Amino acid sequence: MNKETLAERLNASAGRQKADTVIKNGKIMDVFNQEWISADIAITGGVIVGLGEYEGEEVIDAEGQMIVPGFIDGHVHIESSMVTPIEFAKAVLPHGVTTVITDPHEIANVSGAKGISFMIEQAKKAPLNIRFMLPSCVPAASFERSGAVLKAEDLKPFYQEKEVLGLAEVMDYVSVAEGEEDMLQKLLDAKRHGKRIDGHLAGLSSDIINIYRTAMVSNDHEVTTKEEALDRIRRGMYVMLREGSVAKNTLNVLPAVNEKNARRFFFCTDDKHVDDLLSEGSVNHQVKMAIKAGLDPFLAYQLASLNAAECYGLETKGAVAPGFDADLLFISDVREAVVTKTMVAGRTVAENGRTVYEQSAGSYSPDQALLDTVRLKAPLTESDFHIPIQEGKKMNVIEMIPNHLETRKKEVPAPSADAFCPDTENDLLKIAVAERHSGEKMIGLGIVQGFGLKEGAIATTISHDSHNIIAVGTNDADLAKAINRLRDTGGGLTAVKNGELLHSVPLPIAGLLSDKSAEWVNDSLGVLHEKLPLLGFTGDFNPFLTLSFLALPVIPDIKMTAAGLFDVKAFQHIPLQ
């Protein structure tokens, strides 16, 4: 801001000149005193310059509606929506989300620094405030087969970007606890630039939390219980209440929030598909859930705005007050969080459930390296899914938990055979992870329980965090067909039955993102999910998103990688038997 800009704002604030915009007849939520106030809102240069009586070049009549600060999603992977940042903005702005803190580690695991650059350049063209945390663990663990490796030196140039707020979720707790050199450098670089550091403490003990706090990690979004939340709060952390397409922890963690500690909590979605964003919303959905569960509405809206802003040092976000950015929501029903108008920097960007802005031309095109990321040299065959077993020895099985990222390690007696065949009666299916980045043929095979498929197979190139191809199926032929379809199309999601392709959603950008509109992807996902009953699927969870997390070897108890079964607590690969 220069001297002329400041003078203009001061003149408008003092009433010496008209404000650019004045909002009248609204009830303003004061998130500091937790009360409603009646006043005009004066806006100049996208910033609130006063609450009181003002005149403006433009006057907006709020018609008695409530005006609250724009919602902030404190931790989200935009790639999980399967659309670009420009399309993601179109999905969340009508729901009142005006700022997101995003970690592009999904695309970074596939395409490295080029993937991060693509996301930042795309974000600059969206009216949504998109701020970035730099991926700290690419790959998620040293043994993982990702498409890139990012060292501290690779991240340093990105700290010059004003959109970058810090270092994203530090999930390799072994590297932190043992003081691994490159991890120490990443942590120090973030603090030397005056940035924040995000945590990822899934299932970790209080002793590890002590280590993370000593490493200057300020928050955690992997909390699933009241007890975990309070333990982190007493050690000085912020805690996020998460509600995504798979991980749904808001109601379990909410009992930890009280009037004394509420300022240390805020909302996030983490991973949410675009169809869920369009139909259900984002942080607005969590506000509604929290109020319905008994949280005071003032606290719910504070969690949705001010608290996240304070955690990340966003001094001009999170409140309707002078000096704050005019990121405002018009709310017709506070308890239901019904957003009728969304303003970003004083500009109306969405009304009555639809965006109302013209997207600037010349969207940033991805590098060719982002469009050629499924590198299986040859099609897979049925023999690639052969799992030899020994009769009489128990098999280690992944037991998935619907709507949770965690799994259970289960031992199941081996059948009387020399090779495992899927057992749909007992819901024991084959799971495969095929490395797709190097061209080397490497396929991890295992057994999973909990999907409930009776026929066919599903597969996707979205498999956190290395994003190799992951598939689950009832027979080898359909597993091969599903994976080969992704090889041919450059990535996406697919469903196969009896050798027939039921439907496929192409994701050509890094095998993670569509080059189509949010609406197009939503419609295509709808067709895909309509086909799932043909496979016998009747679950109340998203099987593709659930499948995508079964390859993440930093969330307990047992996961599947391209190198085979991985015991997260022991932090080592284990045999099937």
UniProtKB/Swiss-Prot annotation:
Keywords: Hydrolase, Manganese. Its EC number is 3.5.4.2. GO terms for molecular function: adenine deaminase activity. The keyword Manganese applies. InterPro entries: Adenine_deam, Adenine_deam_C, Amidohydro-rel, Metal-dep_hydrolase_composite, Metal_Hydrolase. Coiled coil: none annotated. HAMAP family: Adenine_deamin. This is Adenine deaminase. The lineage of its organism: Bacteria, Bacillati, Bacillota, Bacilli, Bacillales. The gene is ade.
